[in-house]
């Protein structure tokens, strides 16, 4: 699990709101999921995050062997394109939290806007989830300012 903070409105050209800050607590991360042929940039702004890359998902938990694994650290970026790195898992294995900023968008020629991320569920079917927000950036800022 992680905290997902969005900035701006849903524009219809990405799965969910296109500008996202994610805060990854220690020993927390995402499930293996697919980004539906979008482009993305992931920028690490604090800590480090392990990223495992997988082939496109199938309804078979035995197909979850990663094909590549690397760690992105503060100041480093990685990317996703329709043909590269679409299916991945992010995990914070460091002794501190990690924070990332992501930007998502479908390509100009892509007219199919899939609003979901796909993942393999516990019953071995391909399921989908809508990438929701835990807070908008302004809501998070307001709550922080009220406390401090």
List each model region and its residues.
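Glycine- and acidic-residue-biased ligand/ion/polar-headgroup-sensing regions
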Residues: 26, 37-55
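Conserved short histidine dyad/triad with adjacent acidic residue
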Residues: 20-35, 71-74, 81-85
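Asparagine-centered strand-capping/turn motif at beta-strand->loop junctions
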Residues: 89-94
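A short hydrophobic beta-strand segment most commonly corresponding to one strand
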Residues: 41-43, 95-110
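Short acidic-glycine-tyrosine-enriched beta hairpin
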Residues: 41, 53-88, 125-130
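Long hydrophobic alpha-helical segments typical of transmembrane helices together
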Residues: 120-148
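A short glycine-rich, His/Asp/Glu-containing loop-to-beta-strand
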Residues: 1-26
């Amino acid at each position: 699990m992680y905290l997902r903070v969005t900035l701006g409105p849903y524009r219809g050209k990405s799965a969910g709101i296109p500008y996202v800050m994610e805060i990854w607590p220690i020993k927390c991360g995402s499930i293996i999921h697919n980004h539906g042929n979008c482009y993305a940039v992931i920028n690490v702004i604090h800590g480090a995050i392990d990223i495992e890359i997988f082939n496109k998902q199938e309804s078979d938990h035995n197909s979850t062997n990663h094909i590549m694994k690397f760690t992105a650290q503060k100041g480093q970026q990685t990317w996703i394109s329709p043909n590269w790195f679409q299916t991945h898992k992010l995990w914070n294995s460091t002794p501190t939290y990690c924070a990332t900023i992501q930007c998502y968008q479908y390509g100009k020629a892509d007219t199919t806007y899939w609003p979901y991320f796909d993942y393999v569920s516990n019953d071995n079917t391909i399921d989908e989830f809508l990438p929701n927000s835990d807070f908008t950036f302004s809501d998070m800022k307001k709550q922080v300012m009220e406390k401090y």
